[in-house]
């Protein structure tokens, strides 16, 4: 009984469209697999230290993901994402934090 209540509670809290979530998952894997291109961008930017290069590279990846999230919300849902959907986007980034941060470590 408690599992059923918790399962339904978690299901009712998820607002992000499944299509958008799937696109974002694919974009995360695409971004981390194209690390050579992003590294070239980072290197050409002339950052002063490895820490700055790391932060800049992660910023590029997060920017790509945010752009996809916003664009897909507009394309699929025909509207801007809600605050709840944005919170779920942040949660998705947190779930993939190790994968995203290890790209530039």
Segments from the language model and where they lie:
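N-terminal leader/targeting segments
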Residues: 1-6, 65-67
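Short terminal alpha-helical segments
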Residues: 3-45
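N-terminal secretory signal sequences
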Residues: 4-7, 22-23, 49, 91, ...
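Non-transmembrane, amphipathic alpha-helical segments
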Residues: 16-23, 50-57, 85
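Charged, amphipathic alpha-helical oligomerization/scaffolding segments
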Residues: 30, 64, 92-95
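Amphipathic alpha-helical interaction modules
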Residues: 32-72
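Charged low-complexity stretches with an acidic bias
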Residues: 72-105
């Amino acid at each position: 009984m408690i599992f059923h209540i918790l399962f339904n509670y978690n299901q009712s809290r998820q607002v992000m469209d499944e299509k958008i979530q799937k696109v974002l998952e694919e974009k995360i894997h695409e971004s981390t697999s194209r690390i050579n291109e992003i590294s070239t961008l980072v290197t050409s930017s002339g950052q002063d230290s490895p820490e700055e290069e790391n932060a800049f590279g992660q910023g590029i990846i997060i920017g790509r993901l945010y752009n996809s999230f916003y664009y897909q919300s507009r394309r699929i849902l025909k509207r801007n994402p809600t605050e709840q959907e944005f919170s779920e986007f942040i949660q998705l980034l947190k779930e993939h934090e190790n994968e995203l941060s290890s790209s530039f470590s």
